[in-house]
Amino acid sequence: AVSTGKVDSKFGAAVETGQAMELVKLALTLPHLDLRGLHCHVGSQVFGEDVYQRTLDIMVPFLAQIRDETGVTLSDLNLGGGYGVRYTAEDEAINIPARLAELAAYLKEETERLGLPMPRFLMEPGRSIVADAGLSLYTVGSVKRIPGYKQYAAVDGGMTDNPRYALYQSRYT
């Protein structure tokens, strides 16, 4: 999994440092903006069941903090995407509808506990709905064989077609 939902991430603004609250307060002062909710993205190829629950453990109290400090109750909470896709036999098959139902129930409990209305709960299916829709097909131009060691195939494609392995060591079948 690629983790993007960390304090030191290049993406977004961290709740933990106060930067997210600063941006919320700034957005609320701008007359041309209508702040309706929060969006976060915790990673890519996420298989762990508790990742999104831990995200709710941060975001729901943050919604309450926004209400308490600004008097504004936001209506939307988007946990982004990132559910893992089963590319290899070792990857877990995820029952996304069941996981979403569990998260929605947990969100309802937590918002009720903090006296918040249930926000519109959003997630983005992303690659989980398109990952099996295509494949990469290359033509082998030549093969270099090194007896007793290995062989290499020169193809008419490369890292620019799919940089994820080089960048993140992502595995595919």
What kind of feature is each model-predicted range?
Residues A14-E16, N95, P117:
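General structural signal for secondary-structure boundaries
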Residues E102, T111, L116-T173:
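Charged (often Lys/Glu-rich) extended helix/loop segments that serve as interaction or gating elements
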Residues A1-D76, V85, Y106, T111, ...:
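Active-site-proximal beta-alpha core segment in soluble small-molecule metabolic enzymes
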Residues V15-Q19, V46, D50, Y87-D91, ...:
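Solvent-exposed, flexible loop/coil residues
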Residues G48-T55, R86-R99, V130-S142:
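Short glycine/threonine-rich loop-to-helix capping motif typified by GTGT followed
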